[in-house]
Design a protein with these regions (language model features):
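ABC ATPase NBD coupling module
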Residues: 1-14, 40, 161-166, 197-203
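Conserved ABC ATPase signature
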Residues: 71-75, 79
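Conserved ABC ATPase "signature" region
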Residues: 48-66, 172-176
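P-loop NTP-binding/switch modules centered on Walker-like glycine-rich loops
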Residues: 101, 105, 109-187
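Short catalytic/signature loops enriched in Gly
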Residues: 158-250
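A short, proline-enriched helix->beta-strand linker immediately N-terminal to the Walker B motif
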Residues: 90-94
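Hydrophobic anchor residue at the start of the ABC signature
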Residues: 34, 85, 109, 113
Length: 250
């Protein structure tokens, strides 16, 4: 992809960064930060038109107009992240990568930002790729889920289906670790064993095998492809679908 193609792609594809503190230029005002993509892509014919669009975007994400000339250090984490969201929306993209957008925020602010992202998705018909380690956020936010382990895709399914019936042992371990208030609904904890292998130079085969209680000889030595288990549920595990009948090997 050449420079021009990448420039054009950015109009449709934007990103909301994890850290609202380091992703904003401290030397630029809030108005300048939000307006920068509009200026680069010549989306405004005049300074007045640019300022008007920036003000509109600030209103969309719930930022007061009085912050137009403020600087990032004057804002708390939640409002800084709203600036990042407004900047991502400025070019009217179709696809936004949300890279752990609430993980660095206070818990009291996380719900506000998540609800804002949900509302914006409905209003502007956005598609999100939402990257997170927080399974509660995943359940609240996602229509489809892809589970990765050491850079390897191990399971994909609709959100409700994966939470109802996880097939991969790693997915089962993740879901079993979610705290559930009701003692009647507790899921049996799946404990992991062993050490992580190097993600830089992984051994062939399932990268989870050395930590899996159900691993057998066929799990190593060759990479495992995703298999279709119906209803859009895919899993890269040679023992998926029969784990309940198996005895852990370790």
């Amino acid at each position: 992809m050449n420079k021009k193609q990448l420039h054009d792609l950015r109009k449709d594809l934007q990103i909301i960064f994890q850290d609202p503190f380091s992703s904003l230029n401290p030397l630029m005002s809030i108005g300048e930060i939000i307006g920068e993509p509009l200026r680069i892509h010549a989306k405004a014919q005049s300074r007045a038109e640019l300022d008007k669009e920036v003000s509109r975007l600030m209103d969309v994400v719930g930022l007061s107009a009085r912050l137009f000339n403020a600087y990032p250090h004057e804002l708390d984490g939640g409002r800084r992240q709203r600036v990042g969201i407004a900047r991502a929306l400025s070019l009217q993209p179709q696809f936004i990568v949300c890279d752990e957008p609430v993980s660095s925020l206070d818990v009291s602010i996380q719900a506000q930002v998540l609800n804002l992202l949900k509302d914006l998705q409905a209003e502007f018909h956005l598609t999100y790729l939402f990257i997170t380690h927080d399974l509660s956020v995943v359940k609240f936010f996602s229509d489809k889920i892809a589970v990765m382990y050491l850079g390897q895709l191990v399971e994909t399914a609709d959100s409700a289906e994966l939470f109802r019936q996880p097939l991969h042992p790693y997915s089962q371990a993740l879901l079993s670790a979610i705290p559930i208030p009701s003692s009647r609904q507790k899921m049996q904890r799946v404990k992991l064993i062993g050490e992580l292998q190097s993600p830089i130079d992984p051994e062939p085969g399932c990268r989870f095998a050395k930590r899996c209680l159900y691993a057998r000889e066929g799990c190593t030595g060759r990479d495992l492809a995703l298999r279709d288990f119906g209803s859009g549920h895919f899993c890269a595990c040679c023992r998926a679908g029969a784990l309940e009948e198996q005895t852990p090997s370790k």
